[in-house]
């Protein structure tokens, strides 16, 4: 995976400079596959026709892929993000062509879940001090992969724990059913199935405990 950081320099590249700097000099591309509505370069000036012309000049092949549709509209990253933000996991999974998952290393937490009777594995989902928001928030039915021979069902919360921390970072906290073990520093994938409810600030830990039990 080659990650391009979107910055002022990248945004200002002309279509020709984008191809020369990124595809030719950077990746030494010989075969380029893009969606049929692909646009590139400053002000989205480049299209498939121009990319094919530049491919002949710089000796790489261009293969456009046809658009895929769902409910009579093209599948796009913005539609997938919208479905995730709405908690519509089945629709997001359909457009992704795979289950939506979050993976990461299990952190040492404050043991609050254990105190409440619902121990959780905690995973950071954004870089420290990031101002970004995760693709999803709320409480979900999930399965955790990478712990044993079979996935383990559970309930996960993606949020900032407003009941106990007014300015906390976003975390993925997952309570696994019928599991007792130490997963610290292990990599775990959490697969999302359906949204149960939004994250909520409760007046007391007892109210929080009751809500978790209902979940």
Over which residues does each language-model region extend?
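Contiguous, small/hydrophobic- and glycine-enriched helical/loop subdomains that border
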Residues: 5
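Classical nucleotidyltransferase
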Residues: 9-119, 203-207, 212
